[in-house]
């Protein structure tokens, strides 16, 4: 149902219904609105299912305003706004590039694992699914750089870039990676924050998925400690994290195509990347743990990112399994 208010008094009545009202209190202070009119207005709203009897406990009691708005606005059915791949910025701006430009000149090359060999020795998918669990305690010997590189390669590298010519939207570029992504857009970036890793100095790095390498952004001990401490608290304070994978989104890359559902898609992409990390880490006998919260402002300040252009949207802990 939809209400189109042709008189300001209708809007005033609706606004007052944000608080508990009786017909008498509803009609007060609004010119020419009597208690009888207020009763008929309420009857109309009930008949059109704009109002419904309150149940005990009401399901609405569990909702926060922003959660319900996000849920209803990113699904169809309760609004008439454009939704989906509307290409709303076509002709206004160019899409962001598939690969983010280097953030520093300090490059750490990563070893590419032998995928053919891995397919022969890796544990079956069903076993990985059954063994998967969140592990927050680590061995004294930390994760190795080779293991970190293998996980990033198997989970997040760019396997292929494809260019398609379209009549309506011109030239479009896509990439393909191990985890799925709506429209093959891949707006997510991965920033390893290293506390303890054999073969890699502590610091904040950016993973370049095409060249399969790390760019060091910061070696500042205080900044690393700050991010690690936040992750430690978010994970239940069981053990100091060895590596924190901060996942960001380059918003413009996905907002360029999708309308109404873009941020919901980002959340789904973070979820499938989490599961990909989990299964790969389980197969590698590592300790994985997804986090539910992180400080996007603090990460933006440390990395120099523009909060509205690229912000952290997920965090994932990785370390060596305690023997």
Locate predicted features:
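Residues forming anionic-ligand binding surfaces in small-molecule and nucleic-acid pockets
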Residues: 111-137, 248-260
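Cell wall/extracellular polymer interaction/catalysis modules
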Residues: 126, 141-144
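Glycine/small-residue-rich phosphate/adenosyl-binding loop
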Residues: 181-274
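Short conserved catalytic/interaction loops centered on acidic-Pro-aromatic/His motifs
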Residues: 256, 281-302, 309
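A glycine-rich helix N-cap at a beta->alpha junction
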Residues: 304-323
């Amino acid at each position: 149902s939809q209400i189109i208010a042709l008189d300001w008094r209708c809007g005033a009545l609706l606004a007052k219904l944000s608080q508990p009202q009786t017909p008498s209190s509803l009609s007060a202070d609004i010119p020419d609105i009597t208690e009888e009119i207020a009763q008929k207005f309420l009857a109309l709203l009930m008949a059109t299912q704009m109002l419904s009897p309150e149940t005990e406990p009401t399901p609405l009691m569990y909702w926060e305003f922003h959660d319900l708005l996000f849920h209803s606005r990113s699904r169809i059915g309760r609004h008439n706004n454009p939704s989906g791949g509307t290409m709303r910025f076509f002709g206004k701006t160019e899409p962001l590039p598939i690969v983010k430009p280097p953030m520093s000149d300090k490059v750490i090359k990563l070893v590419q694992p032998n995928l053919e060999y891995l397919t022969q020795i890796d544990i079956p998918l069903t076993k990985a699914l059954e063994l998967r669990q969140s592990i927050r305690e680590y061995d004294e010997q930390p994760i190795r750089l080779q293991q970190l590189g293998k996980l990033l390669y198997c989970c997040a590298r760019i396997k292929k870039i494809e260019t398609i010519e379209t009549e309506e939207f011109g030239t479009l570029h896509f990439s393909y990676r191990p985890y799925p992504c709506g429209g093959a857009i891949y707006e997510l970036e991965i920033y390893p924050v290293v506390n303890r890793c054999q073969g890699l100095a502590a610091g904040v790095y950016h993973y370049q998925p095409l060249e399969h390498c790390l760019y060091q952004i910061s070696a500042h001990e205080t900044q690393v400690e700050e991010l690690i401490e936040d992750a430690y608290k978010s994970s239940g304070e069981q053990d100091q994290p060895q590596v924190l994978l901060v996942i960001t989104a380059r918003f413009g890359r996905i907002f360029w195509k999708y309308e109404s559902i873009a941020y919901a898609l980002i959340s789904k992409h973070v979820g499938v990347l989490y599961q990909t990390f989990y299964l790969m880490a389980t197969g590698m006998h590592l300790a994985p743990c997804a986090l539910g919260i992180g400080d996007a402002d603090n990460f933006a300040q440390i990395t120099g990112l523009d909060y509205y252009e690229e912000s952290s949207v997920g965090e994932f802990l990785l370390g060596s399994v305690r023997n």
